[in-house]
């Protein structure tokens, strides 16, 4: 991690298996409004910012700030586990770390608690299953993302989470299902 000279962005560098820089993600440090976020041109998305530990656990995040916030919230034995950022929701960096590190067989998807993050959780779980990884779990932040959880812990007003519209309807649909099933059973013999 370093600060770029021109705009004072935080730059998160991803290294390949030989320690060569292959990816850089910039995040603006300006605190008023939306900060700049983007990958440096020519970055290889397979080698995003990551940390590889000795345990079998891999935690997956949309962005480096989310990853660092999560680690700050879960400091106990953090160096033992592995972490990777997707710099969005693409699977390239996740699959690269799993291929490079065969000891990783427990995957925790820690994406943002918003519509895009929830949809990406489902998509990534499908990709993981297709690639033979079935020991997966979804960990959601209480607020919009792990950085917002960290802000809330320190008394700063967090951005709330956003549920997926289809998940909001789930309790309503679940409530009427038993009655619907009973009604269908009663009319089973109707042809």
Residue spans for each PLM region:
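A short, charged/proline- and glycine-enriched loop
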Residues: 52-58
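Cytosolic beta-strand hydrophobic patch enriched in CBS
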Residues: 11-14, 59, 84
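Helix N-cap/beta->alpha junction signal
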Residues: 62-63
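Phosphate-binding glycine-rich loops and their immediate beta-loop-alpha structural context
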Residues: 69
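Basic, glycine-enriched DNA-binding surface that flanks or lies within the catalytic cores of DNA
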Residues: 1-45, 49
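Conserved Rossmann-like nucleotide-cofactor binding loop
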Residues: 66
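TOPRIM fold recognition
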Residues: 72-191
């Amino acid at each position: 991690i370093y600060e770029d000279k021109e705009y004072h962005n935080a730059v998160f560098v991803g290294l390949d298996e030989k320690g060569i820089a292959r990816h850089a993600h910039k995040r603006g440090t300006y605190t008023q409004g939306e900060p700049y976020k983007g990958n440096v041109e020519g970055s290889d998305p397979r080698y995003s910012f990551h940390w590889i530990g000795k345990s079998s656990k891999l935690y997956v995040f949309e962005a480096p700030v989310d990853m660092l916030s999560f680690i700050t919230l879960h400091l106990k034995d953090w160096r033992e586990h592995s972490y990777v950022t997707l710099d969005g929701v693409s699977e390239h960096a996740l699959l690269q770390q799993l291929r490079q590190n065969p000891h990783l067989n427990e995957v925790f998807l820690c994406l943002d608690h918003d519509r895009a993050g929830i949809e990406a959780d489902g998509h990534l779980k499908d990709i993981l299953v297709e690639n033979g990884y079935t020991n997966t779990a979804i960990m959601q932040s209480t607020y919009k993302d792990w950085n917002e959880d960290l802000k809330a812990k320190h008394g700063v007003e967090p951005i709330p989470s956003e549920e997926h519209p289809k998940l909001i309807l789930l309790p309503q649909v679940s409530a009427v299902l038993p009655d619907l099933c009973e009604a269908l059973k009663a009319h089973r013999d109707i042809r």
